[in-house]
C-alpha cells in the first residue's frame, strides 16, 4: 500500500466555510413562532427551552441546523410552535449574542432576558457539595 505523504485529506482541500464576519438580516418572530432561551440540552437533537411567555417547551433541532449550528445552554433561539402539540416546537434559528442584544433593545425580548449567560435559570437540584476526607481514619 502507498504511504501517506500528503498534508491531509480531502477535507483539507475543501477548506473551511468561514462566513462568521457576514452580517445577516435580523429575523423577527411571526405568527406561530416564539423567542426562547435554551435551559437544557437533552441530546439526540432535542433541547428544553423556556419560552418568553413563561412556558417550558421541548424543542427539536431541525435537520438544516443540526451539526452545522451549535446550540448551547443559554442561547436565544427562535422556536416554531406546533399547532397540534403546544408543549413542543422546532428550532428555526439561533441568534448570536449581538443579535439577541439588538432584539432586547428593540423590545422584542423582555428586559428580564439574560443574554450570553450559561446559568440562566438557577441551579435546579445542583448544590455545591464539599467533601472532607480524614486520612487518619482510613
Curated annotation (Swiss-Prot):
Domain S1-like: 22-96
GO molecular function: double-stranded RNA binding; RNA strand annealing activity; translation initiation factor activity
Region of interest called Disordered, as start-end residue ranges on this chain: 1-28
Record's keyword annotation contains Protein biosynthesis: yes
PROSITE patterns xref list: IF1A, S1_IF1_TYPE
GO biological processes: cytoplasmic translational initiation; translational initiation
Segments of skewed composition (Basic and acidic residues): 16-27
Bias (Basic residues) ranges: 1-15
UniProt keyword terms in alphabetical order: Initiation factor, Protein biosynthesis
GO cellular component, one term: cytosol
SMART domains referenced in this protein's UniProt entry, alphabetically: eIF1a (SM00652)
Protein task: Seems to be required for maximal rate of protein biosynthesis. Enhances ribosome dissociation into subunits and stabilizes the binding of the initiator Met-tRNA(I) to 40 S ribosomal subunits.
NCBIfam families per the UniProt record, alphabetical: eIF-1A
Entry's family note: Belongs to the eIF-1A family.
Protein name: Eukaryotic translation initiation factor 1A
Organism encoding this protein: Schizosaccharomyces pombe (strain 972 / ATCC 24843) (Fission yeast)
